[in-house]
C-alpha cells in the first residue's frame, strides 16, 4: 500500500462530482461528472469530505411534533435557526437522547468537543463519504470503531428497528465524521450528488 495514494469512499447512489451543478446529471452522462482522479490542489490537504448539508429551518409543526421534548427545555428553538442544530436534528429524527447517550461513550476530550460541535453547528458533511490517504484512514477507523463498539453495548439492538433508529450506528458515524475530520485533518469540501433513479 502506497502511503501517498488517495483512497475514497462513496455510497449507494451518492457520488463525488467535479461540478456543483447537478440538475442535468443522469445515468447516461454521470461519467462526465465523476471525480476519478485527485485534483492537483488536493496536495494541500489531508482529507476530502462532502460539502455540508444544513439541518436548520424545519417547519414549525415538524419541530413541535418530533422535537417537543427539546422545546420543553428551550422554546426558542421554534424561532431561532441557530438553535436548530445537529443535536436537535438527531433527537428529532433518530430518537431523543440517543446522540447524547453515544457522546457519553467517547473519551473525555472528544466528549466535550463533539457535544460542543453538535450543539453549535447546524451543518454537517453527510453520507460517511471521504477521500484520504491510508494513515488518516487508519486513524479515523481507530477512533470510530472502538466508540461504535461501546455504543453497541448501550443501545438495545431490538429497539433499533425502523427508519429512525435501524441504522443508528451509521447515523452516529455520519455526524462524528464531520467533527473528527475537521478537528484532526486539513480538509477540503468537494461536490457530491445523490441520484435516486439508478
Kindly give the residue locations of the regions a language model identified.
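ER/Golgi luminal nucleotide-sugar-dependent glycosyltransferases, focusing on the catalytic module
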Residues: 1-198
